[in-house]
A protein has these predicted regions:
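A conserved pocket-lining segment of Rossmann-fold NAD(P)-dependent short-chain dehydrogenase/reductase
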Residues: 274, 377-404, 408-412, 416, ...
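Phosphopantetheine-dependent thiolation modules in NRPS/PKS and related acyl-activating systems
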Residues: 2-158
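Conserved Rossmann-fold NAD(P)-dependent oxidoreductase catalytic core, especially the SDR/UDP-sugar
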Residues: 257, 261-265, 272-280, 284-333, ...
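Mid/C-terminal beta-alpha module of Rossmann-like enzyme folds, strongest
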Residues: 412-480, 521-536
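A hydrophobic C-terminal alpha-helical subdomain
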Residues: 392, 457-504
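N-terminal Rossmann/SDR dinucleotide-binding element
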Residues: 65, 127-261, 265-268, 275
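Active-site Tyr-X1-5-Lys
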Residues: 328-359
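Amphipathic terminal alpha-helices
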Residues: 122-151, 155, 170, 193-200, ...
């Protein structure tokens, strides 16, 4: 069973990748006796396991023992440090967070103890074990993804769109309590007259509404917008990971009959968890949304996906018609689960479901610094600003302010001829990380030392401490550097997005890159992520 902390994390009650404190047991005489059964002192690996309340005899993996992504990152870091400290620096690179979620602690402890005791062939056994686990894990994961992606819910339901009836009038929205969701809710209130039913996980309706209001507050709504919220918004108590969202048959029928449009934005965004850990919400949740979309009443589905479905693609240009059908270069749970989720939507569209797919790249805070976004890009930029380091890498960095992206998504959905299309919600003009740090330097007076990507990552690793927001993502960054380098000149085509945005009376053009970066900086200052002497 996962721990309560894990469950709260998955439900969205915890801030993504917020810091945790690991309580260390004192290594005094009594605790040493527990560790080493009477020995005067414990070896480094035993001490490490004890620090995380592990004995080394557990048959479960860290994930099974309830370690959330933050604690996994802490353990992986400390394990690598211990392995290096014991003189096996070349083996520390074998430590992979995805594998630590799978290996039994008893097996891991036996492997590291072999190193500590200088057992014959210990290094070989260590490397071979991790290579074996990686191979088995990858094969099982690929098989699971292919099976999940091939699932045809419409065929199972024997769904015929011609038999669906008209009648629903409400909009149904998932993921409204995350970062992007409140901006979608705002845009729906502004650009439509329909009532909105919002899926929220909670034990009671008043608790759900309070949680939704707190999320909406992060975008600083006007009094007029709050009035619209009070008049037109109501919550649906439910859980994306459960069949029919956990609703009673009567509640499900009521929802089916009242809704004619769905915006599916709900998902876990996490760069550390593996596919299986994200499957229930990101994949099974999409199936339940599709089950609603293919219900009694005709509905349109607007699916919020991501450009991460392309993984570490090395194609020169990625078009909106591309679907990464061969599942290429997908090696972390978020990209994998969102790819499968998208395939499920495409499967339903082949049977006649009216749907659109939107793929944002990097969603940033609004140009006024609103929202609550602590994703990898914000963490990395805060770290770079703190240390005055940048990179010469030419990878496309496409930041779309959340308010603008949400506004244009809703605007495009008003056009009936946009049904059946996919849209890359990206900036029209190319920009690199160097362009971003140049503007940050102008706004803050901070000087940035630029490194090649090959040298940039070691600089980050050498400077990053456990209290840095970036720390939990270090393993991901190190493991990804070669992939990032290989796709340096990849670009996203957003022809559909530009065409329909420009055709819509509500469509809004990209703000300047300076405005986007200033919004990011304002957010970081407002949330005390960074501090600068020069005011903006």
């Amino acid at each position: 069973m996962r721990s309560n902390m894990k469950q709260r994390y998955l439900s969205g009650d915890l801030e993504l990748l917020s810091r945790i404190e690991i309580q260390e047991t004192r290594s005094d005489e009594s605790s040493t006796k527990v560790i080493a059964e009477g020995a005067a002192s414990a070896d480094a690996f035993t001490q490490l396991f004890h620090k995380y309340q592990l004995t080394g005899s557990e048959s479960e993996s860290l994930a099974d023992l309830g370690f959330d992504s933050l604690k996994l990152a802490e353990f992986a870091h400390d394990l690598k440090e211990t392995i290096s400290g014991e003189g096996f620096d070349e083996l520390s690179s074998e430590i992979d967070l995805r594998l630590l979620q799978k290996i039994a602690m008893s097996e891991l402890f036996e492997l590291v103890q072999g190193l500590n005791q200088a057992a014959p062939q210990a290094k070989f056994r260590f490397k071979s074990a991790f290579q074996r686990i990686h191979k088995e894990f990858s094969q099982l994961e690929q098989e699971m993804m292919r099976t999940d992606a091939a699932y045809d819910l419409a065929m199972e339901l024997e769904w015929n769109p011609s038999k669906s009836s008209a009648g629903g009038k409400d909009i149904f929205l998932t993921g409204a309590t995350g970062f992007f969701g409140p901006f979608l809710l705002k845009s729906l209130l502004e650009q439509s007259n329909q009532d909105l039913q919002i899926l929220v996980r909670a034990d009671a309706e008043d608790t759900a509404m309070e949680r939704l209001r707190q999320a909406f507050e992060t975008i600083r709504p006007s009094s007029e917008l709050w009035n619209l919220f009070d008049q037109r918004v109501r919550v649906v108590l439910g859980d994306l990971s459960k069949s029919a969202f956990g609703l009673s048959p009567a509640a499900w029928r009521k929802l089916d009959e009242e809704v004619n449009c769905i915006y599916h934005n709900g998902a876990i965004v996490n760069y550390l968890l593996d596919y299986e850990s994200m499957r229930a919400i990101n994949v099974d949740g999409t199936n339940e949304v599709l089950r609603l979309a293919m219900g009694k009443v005709q509905k349109e589905l607007n699916h919020i996906s991501t450009t991460f479905i392309f993984g570490w693609s090395v194609k020169d240009t990625l078009y909106e018609t591309d679907q990464n059908a061969e599942m290429e270069r997908l090696d972390f749970g978020y990209s994998q689960s969102k790819w499968v989720s998208e395939q499920l939507v495409f499967n339903a569209m082949k049977h006649g479901l009216k749907a659109r797919v939107f793929r944002p790249a990097l969603i940033s805070p609004s140009i006024h610094g609103e929202g609550y976004n602590f994703d990898i890009s914000i963490r990395l930029l805060a770290f770079m600003l703190k240390h005055g380091i940048g990179t010469l890498a030419q990878n496309q960095v496409s930041f779309t302010p959340a308010n603008l992206g949400a506004h244009n998504i809703v605007a495009i959905c008003q056009a009936s001829d946009s049904i059946g299309l996919t849209f890359h919600v990206t900036r029209d003009q190319y920009a690199s990380m160097g362009d971003i740090t140049q503007i940050l330097g102008q706004l803050t007076g901070k000087a940035f030392q630029a490194f090649s990507l090959k040298d940039f990552v070691p600089e980050v690793v050498g400077r990053c401490q456990k209290d840095d927001l970036l720390f939990p993502l270090l393993n991901f960054l190190v493991k990804s550097v070669d992939n990032i380098s290989s796709m340096e000149f990849k670009l996203y085509s957003n022809a559909n997005y530009r065409k329909f945005r420009q055709a819509s009376p509500q469509g809004v053009e990209d703000p300047s890159l300076s405005e986007v970066v200033q919004g990011i900086l304002t957010f970081m200052l407002n949330h005390h992520i960074v501090s600068i002497e020069k005011k903006i």
